[in-house]
Structure formats: C-alpha cells, structure tokens
Regions:
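Thiamine diphosphate
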Residues: 1-92
Length: 92
C-alpha cells in the first residue's frame, strides 16, 4: 500500500504545524514493474473499483504476485484524513 508519504510523520507535522510539512513526501518507483522484471505478476491499482478484479486475477494465477496499491495521500487512517487533522489544528 503506497500513499506517497511517511504517513505517521506527516500526521504529526500536520497536527503540530498545519500546512507546513517537510520531508514526508515519497516518490516511489513502479513496484509492479520491478516485480515483472523478476518474473512475477505485477499490477498497479489506483482506483477502488479495480482492486477486487486485480486481486481475483492474482489469486487464480497461483504464482508470485505484487499488487501495488496507490492511495490518496490525504487518507491517513480509516478514521480520519490529513485534511481533517490540519483543520482541527488550525482551529486550536
């Protein structure tokens, strides 16, 4: 799962210094391409509706598989977003 950031660090930065983050963004390589280069199945998924079909293909394949899931950076946990943390910190 790839949200393009050091999530916990980013969360603390937004809480303590809203809107002023530093060094928490990641620019990851194409991990699915790496997997394919080594003979594995590899697929990049960045839309929710594409996840289940990709997962089903790989379960049926029965071979080593890497599924690179790209999430929105703002989705930091299942309960909150970076935007909500930033807004709460700005109100405080």
């Amino acid at each position: 799962v790839d949200n393009g950031s050091y999530g916990t660090i980013r969360m603390h930065q937004e809480r303590e210094y809203p809107g002023r983050t530093s060094g928490s963004d990641l620019f990851n390589p194409d991990f699915a391409a790496f997997a394919r280069a080594f003979g594995w199945n590899g697929e990049f998924v960045d839309r929710t509706e594409d996840f289940e079909p990709a997962l089903q293909r790989f379960v049926k394949a029965g071979t080593p598989t890497l599924l690179h899931l790209k999430l929105d950076t703002d989705v930091i946990t299942t309960r909150t977003t970076l935007g909500a943390i930033r807004a709460a910190a700005q109100r405080a």
